[in-house]
Amino acid sequence: MASGKEIRTQIGSIKNTQKITSAMEMVAASKMRRAQDRMELGKPYASRMRAVVGHLANGNPEYKHLYLQEREVKRVGYIIVSSDRGLCGGLNVNVFKQVIVHSKAWADKGVGVDLCMIGAKGTSFFNSVGGNIVASVRDIGEKPKVSDLIGSVKVMLDAFAEQKIDKLYLVGNEFVNTMTQLPSVEQLLPLQPDEDKKLQHQWDYIYEPEARELLDGLLVRYIESQVYQAVVENGACEQAARMIAMKNATDNAGDLIDGLQLVYNKARQAAITQELSEIVSGAAAV
């Protein structure tokens, strides 16, 4: 059994770690609320952009933009959103597993896979497993900007336009609530028909310049907005997952301290009992 001094040292060390994890939990909770606000602020823009693109596409059915055309799939691309830092539980691992399963289904059909990475953790992981990374961006911070993402997104859009890839997917985390974040895979290109019944009416807007020119520009902006929204939402997921991970670490540290305190008390009791026994034995000998 360890000595009382060793146990006290262990308890002190764990208490110091517990203070750190508790502080990190509070910081993550504060950052999560701000990230949620950014996520909610971005949703109306992305939703409205989708509606406008839908109106334009429905109002001009004879015009099939390249981003709307289905073709034989020979190669697919993935834009993968991960965090730059760790200590957020299985958040990134769940996304990576989803990518591996999804891409394997294509690979089994003889389809090649290209990857665009957003976040240091994803870049590190797929470099280690031999993924074909064609673009990457990292260190975008807690307040990402669309301008930070445009370069990497453009690489994938150009690849689709040049028919180097035939489908483009966006993979990230969906924020359900503080306790639940789910990995999601969404097809970005070619764009899927909008099932919203609100878009099935017959009226249309009058656009300047003409709708076709506007659609060309809006489709690119729409893809960029979807990627940006995924990055912002992943940021909220990251802070929520980190808060839960640090709470669990703090609770586990408390359990360890309780267990070590019990061991220390038993060791101290045994030492006192032994001393009393020696005193009694010495008195009896006299």
UniProtKB/Swiss-Prot annotation:
PROSITE patterns: ATPASE_GAMMA. GO terms for biological process: proton motive force-driven plasma membrane ATP synthesis. CDD domains: F1-ATPase_gamma. It is a peripheral membrane protein. It comes from the Bacteria. Its main location: membrane. One of its GO terms (cellular component) is plasma membrane. Keywords: ATP synthesis, Cell inner membrane, Cell membrane, CF(1), Hydrogen ion transport, Ion transport, Membrane, Transport. One of its GO terms (molecular function) is proton-transporting ATP synthase activity, rotational mechanism. It is found in: Cell inner membrane. Belongs to the ATPase gamma chain family. Produces ATP from ADP in the presence of a proton gradient across the membrane. The gamma chain is believed to be important in regulating ATPase activity and the flow of protons through the CF(0) complex. F-type ATPases have 2 components, CF(1) - the catalytic core - and CF(0) - the membrane proton channel. CF(1) has five subunits: alpha(3), beta(3), gamma(1), delta(1), epsilon(1). CF(0) has three main subunits: a, b and c. This is ATP synthase gamma chain. It comes from Saccharophagus degradans (strain 2-40 / ATCC 43961 / DSM 17024). The gene is atpG.
